[in-house]
Amino acid sequence: MRQWYCGLLLLVMTTPSAAQTIRRSFQTTDGMMLSFLEAGSEHRNNPTIVLMPGWLMPGRIWQRQLSDFSRSYHTLALDPRGQGESQVPSSGYTAERRATDLHEFLLQRSNILLIGWSLGGIEALQYVYMFGTARLAALVLVDSSVGEEPAAGSSGRFKDDFRRDRDKTLRQFVRAIFAKPPPEKEIAELVRGATRMPVEASLALLDYPFERSHWRNIVRRFEKPLLYVVTPQYEEQAANLKKNRPATEVELFKKAGHALFVDEPQRFDALIKKFAARLS
């Protein structure tokens, strides 16, 4: 596959010990330019940390983690197709294509600690299903359903509201993912970015045509270290995964919102660094 990377300085972190964050891009095999953020450099024996955002969110939602992790780890945050600064194509909004995008992004890398939040966790599992675990050191799933019981509630009404008034529904959605809402300017920026993707493409990401057992089987069979970080909405799924896959590490954030790594960054970052240290 032909790939090229073009970088420009995005920003310089104000903390002296933090690395610069660079925005780069690469071209997929179907011709799409996907953007990502990169911070830090490779450290001997340390895994490369790759961060996957959730539904319609940009990679920069991990900005605190990029700054923190890059002190010791090469850290990357991908903008999936149609999200963040990546190209918005007319097609490719399927689990298979987006897992392929991730595969192509990781081709030049190894010893990866892959962290997927929400939809990013589902797509990380699809990557494992399609391409295996040879490049992975471990996997972290952040507040994502894994197909265990109980099932999440129906999203039918949300989809109807989204079609009827996308901007209003997105504003409500973005506010709801935080227990401690950020300033309105930041919410507006996240909403504005989320509207880049066409309505039906956005909703297609919520309707991957797989039985819940598909995800359950992937995660139960995952043979490398696995950390499942959840809020109370997935507490029962986490307990059942622990029962069915005892090696799974589980951490519950009782007071955080869905974007728990934004609400409680110090606790989340310490948890990930402790987990990553055991992989070195």
Language model features: what each stretch is:
Residues L125-R166:
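Flexible "cap/lid" loop of the alpha/beta hydrolase fold
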Residues V199-L252:
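Conserved serine/cysteine hydrolase catalytic core
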Residues A256-D269:
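Catalytic histidine-centered segment of alpha/beta-hydrolase-like enzymes
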Residues P53-W55, G116-G121:
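Conserved alpha/beta-hydrolase "nucleophile elbow" surrounding the catalytic nucleophile
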Residues E149-G153, R164-R221:
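Conserved alpha/beta-hydrolase catalytic His-Asp/Glu region
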Residues M32-Q87:
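Conserved HGGG/HGGXW glycine-rich cap/lid loop of the alpha/beta-hydrolase fold
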Residues T29, L37, S67, A77-I115, ...:
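Active-site loop/oxyanion-hole signature of alpha/beta-hydrolase fold enzymes
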Residues A19-M33:
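N-terminal cap/lid segment of alpha/beta-hydrolase-fold proteins
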